[in-house]
């Protein structure tokens, strides 16, 4: 994909200046751990040194552009890089080069699904020996492994809270990513686990993790194996939680932090 062509096609920016344009395949934040050639944005000088090797294009301001190495990345200079970036992300909702392909939902053997549950018709994979109780909602781009138990009222693969201010208006950001529950996960009543924002990313709950009622898990979170997460806990977006952790009653983990193996949070 070429940024100049996309900005013109979707009429996102009337005024922009491109230098040393390079092709890219997806969008990502500056420090995203991916190897896919991507376009990102930098609207603060403190992020200039955080670009990973997969970045090809950077949306940025005229002032910050002077701090970036044109030999390494291409630049697109705009007034508000953050808003331009997320408006482009939203505009690509029907772009087959960007979003995930569509397939019919697949359900494994010996799986029990309540007639009151709602399962998306497309882009869901449910393994063998799964139990899904009443009033569960499973949205597209969700994978549920074998031997999982999903109790009443759970919401899987929902859209998360991501909004941007734009003058006197506020716009929401589309979520094209997925949610993966690995084998032997149990989630109790009325918990919400949201899908990731980017099409290349998943919110992930690993093997044998048990999640209590009324827990909120945000987009892009990665939870390791054999964790126990107690009622009322909140885990902010893009947080990484290792294996064998305990997250106690009503604990809150802010977004973007990393917690090692065997941690105890109360």
Task: Go through the PLM ranges and name each one.
Residues 1-104, 109-110, 147, 153-154, ...:
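Terminal amphipathic alpha-helical/low-complexity segments used for targeting or macromolecular assembly
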Residues 41, 100-266:
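Structural signal for interior beta-strand "rungs" in well-ordered beta-sheet cores
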